[in-house]
């Protein structure tokens, strides 16, 4: 819409009120005046809706001010642009003679200055005619000759102006994109000149109505150019099919083809893509036959050029020996110096590809390359790691320091810069959502909520770290953990028959950390752990007892003090006497009752005497983690305290396996001691006549 054009549509708002005495119209502030003072997006949308419905953009209040006056006073640029688009007059004065231009300030004043620079003739004529060829605004149309134009609705002008304001024409954008549009217009004018010979009519919507501007006919172009009125489907080039390409190959089969390095694009014949373009003859008499039939060899890049730069020399980098070239005689190829690549001779058969001479590093060579800079990169070599695992470290005084160092060793073990791609990340990324969740649950990780593109990458990284921890400790991450009777760590020891050196070293380090953390002031020394075993599996020959038989015979692991282990047997005896239903519901009491019924004595073995309650809880939980809760009669798993809560399942199982191996050693030294129903005391405190609270009274005196 021209900025100074007036809206001629009839407003739908009600007529201004009149005074009963004089009958003269008494203008008052309309809704547009209130909206013009606000710069919010809601106000701009509401004002645009009112203007589209036919509100008067130049309505005045009692002081003669228009909505544009309010927009300029409050420095509301967006509202001023909207009002100018719908035909507001910036030079209309109020009762005091002030115009919107005179009271404007800030960004609104700058906009009005730029707006006032160009004359009305330029704004109405030049820019509309200039950008009509490629503008997307609905205020410009190009029609054919002798074609009727549909009549417009009364509010069509306001709707067209609103659409123009929404999409952003030149005036509303303050002529900021004028240069870009001018450059793009040159191509549009060039296309219109070559594709049009008829007369064009531009229908321009103005405040006076529809104005038709006729463009004079241009001269007809040359005969070689196929002139058309506009772009159509027939102008598009035909896409060649297989038959066309095959026919073109048959025609050009006799001409020699130059075998050069291609760009990777499809070799579609030029004659099919551009049928109207004349093919220029190529001068072949200067080109020899040998040049046309030989392959053009490209110089191989020098992969060692980086090590000759000053930056690499200052960093202490040096080229490491690469893998031997792909040659049948590696010894001779290593002695010979590399020659300049020559042009190979052509042969009728299939040409052999040259050997790959690109230098690369293997995993061992990478470690040798970084051997001198281990301290800079804070990486330990492979031999240092193995020696560190075999030799147990000294016990530290601070538990937090020891555990932090252990975690640092794990992280350095998992994510080092020299980690070779073992295919784990590709395996993980191929997992589906359900498979990924099940793999995470094996390591005690439960995803919260659904997996999207952002959270899946995080859980993939966690799973990769856990799998590499297992791989670095000698286990297979793809092993079926569910099918194993015990934990994979205990199964490994049972299969080998002994504790590996690195396995025992890590377990000793965990034992030292537990001792240092849960001993000292504030901790007691009266707790221990105990094991209750099945005599049918354990047998009576302690000397020939194996670790596998010992582990399979354990059906209960507990922690207690004083006579706590006897409490299970006393409860079972009382239930047997009273014949209660607890023998059927409690698996532990049911097993004890079954063994006593068969006439067996039940062996009990106590370990880790004189420790605190927290340390005994950790040891009990580690043994349960190694044996697995499903193989025991315990109702729940153990409890971890302190820094042991952050242990992973591998560390817990390794420590529990270590404790079981020690328990077997002490059992062989002390022997098997059986508990029967007959040799049990009546209570846990047989030498106390009446415990405090039992019986509800004082202890009776002994008669004289």
From Swiss-Prot:
Highest rank taxon of the organism: Eukaryota
Membrane-spanning intervals of the chain: none
Ranges of biased composition (kind: Low complexity): 8-22, 329-346, 384-405
SMART domains: ANK, LEM
GO cellular component, one term: midbody
Domain spans labelled LEM: 425-470
Residues covered by the GIY-YIG domain: 525-635
Described function: Endonuclease which, in association with baf-1, plays an essential role during embryogenesis in the DNA repair response following DNA damage probably by ensuring proper chromosome segregation. Also required during postembryonic cell divisions after DNA damage caused by ionizing radiation to ensure normal cell proliferation. Resolves chromatin bridges in late mitosis that result from incomplete DNA replication, defective chromosome condensation or unresolved recombination intermediates.
Protein name (Swiss-Prot/TrEMBL): Ankyrin repeat and LEM domain-containing protein 1 homolog
Species this chain originates from: Caenorhabditis elegans
Gene: lem-3
């Amino acid at each position: 819409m021209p900025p100074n054009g007036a809206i001629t549509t009839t407003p739908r708002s009600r007529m201004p009120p009149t005074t009963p005495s004089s009958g003269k119209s008494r203008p008052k502030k309309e809704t547009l005046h209130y909206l013009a003072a606000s710069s919010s997006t809601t106000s701009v949308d509401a004002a645009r809706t009112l203007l589209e419905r036919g509100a008067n953009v130049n309505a005045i209040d009692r002081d003669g001010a228009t909505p544009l006056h309010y927009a300029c006073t409050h420095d509301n640029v967006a509202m001023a642009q909207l009002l100018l688009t719908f035909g507001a007059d910036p030079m209309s004065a109020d009762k005091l003679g002030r115009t919107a231009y005179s009271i404007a300030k800030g960004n609104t004043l700058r906009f009005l200055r730029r707006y006032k620079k160009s004359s009305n003739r330029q704004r109405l004529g030049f820019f509309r005619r200039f950008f009509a060829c490629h503008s997307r605004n609905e205020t410009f149309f190009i029609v054919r000759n002798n074609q009727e134009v549909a009549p417009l609705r009364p509010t069509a002008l306001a709707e067209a102006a609103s659409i123009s304001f929404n999409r952003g024409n030149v005036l509303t954008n303050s002529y900021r994109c004028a240069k870009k549009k001018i450059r793009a217009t040159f191509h549009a004018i060039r296309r219109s000149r070559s594709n049009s010979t008829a007369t064009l009519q531009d229908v321009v919507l103005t405040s006076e109505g529809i104005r038709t501007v006729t463009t004079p006919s241009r001269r007809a172009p040359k005969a070689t150019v196929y002139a058309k009125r506009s772009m159509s489907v027939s102008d598009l080039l035909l896409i060649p099919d297989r038959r066309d390409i095959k026919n073109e190959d048959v025609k050009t089969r006799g001409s020699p083809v130059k075998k050069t390095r291609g760009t990777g694009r499809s070799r579609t014949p030029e004659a099919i893509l551009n049928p109207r373009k004349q093919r220029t003859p190529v001068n072949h008499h200067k080109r020899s036959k040998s040049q046309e039939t030989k392959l053009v060899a490209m110089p191989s890049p020098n992969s060692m050029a980086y090590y000759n730069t000053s930056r690499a020399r200052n960093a202490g980098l040096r080229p490491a020996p690469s893998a031997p070239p792909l040659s049948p005689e590696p010894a001779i190829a290593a002695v010979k110096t590399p020659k300049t690549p020559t042009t190979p001779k052509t042969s009728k058969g299939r040409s052999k590809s040259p050997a790959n001479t690109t230098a690369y590093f293997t995993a061992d060579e990478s470690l040798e390359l970084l051997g001198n800079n281990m301290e800079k990169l804070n990486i330990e070599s492979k031999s240092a790691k193995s020696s560190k695992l075999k030799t147990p470290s000294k016990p530290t005084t601070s538990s937090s320091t020891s555990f932090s160092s252990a975690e640092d060793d794990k992280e350095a073990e998992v994510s080092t810069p020299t980690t070779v791609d073992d295919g784990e990340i590709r395996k993980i990324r191929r997992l589906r959502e359900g498979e990924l969740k099940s793999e995470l649950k094996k390591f005690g990780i439960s995803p919260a909520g659904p997996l999207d593109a952002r959270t899946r990458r995080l859980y993939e990284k966690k799973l990769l770290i856990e799998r590499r921890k297992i791989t670095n400790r000698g286990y297979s991450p793809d092993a079926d953990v569910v099918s194993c009777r015990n934990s994979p760590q205990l199964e490994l020891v049972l299969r080998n028959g002994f504790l590996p050196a690195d396995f025992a070293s890590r377990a000793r380090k965990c034992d030292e950390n537990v001792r240092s953390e849960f001993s000292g002031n504030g901790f007691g020394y009266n707790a221990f752990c105990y094991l209750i075993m099945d005599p049918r599996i354990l047998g009576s020959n302690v000397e020939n007892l194996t670790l596998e038989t010992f582990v399979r015979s354990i059906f209960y692991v507990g922690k207690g003090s004083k006579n706590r282990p006897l409490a299970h047997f006393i409860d079972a005896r009382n239930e047997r006497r009273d014949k209660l239903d607890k023998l059927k519901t409690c698996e532990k009491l049911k097993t004890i009752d079954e063994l006593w019924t068969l006439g067996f004595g039940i062996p009990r073995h106590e370990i880790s005497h004189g420790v605190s309650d927290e340390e005994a809880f950790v040891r009990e939980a580690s043994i349960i983690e190694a044996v697995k809760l499903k193989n025991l009669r315990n109702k729940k798993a153990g409890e971890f305290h302190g820094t042991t809560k952050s242990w992973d399942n591998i560390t817990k199982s390794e420590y529990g396996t270590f404790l079981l191996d020690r328990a077997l050693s002490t059992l062989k030294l002390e022997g098997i001691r059986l508990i029967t129903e007959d040799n049990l005391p009546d209570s846990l405190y047989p030498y106390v006549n009446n415990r405090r609270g039992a019986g509800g009274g004082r202890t009776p005196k002994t008669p004289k």
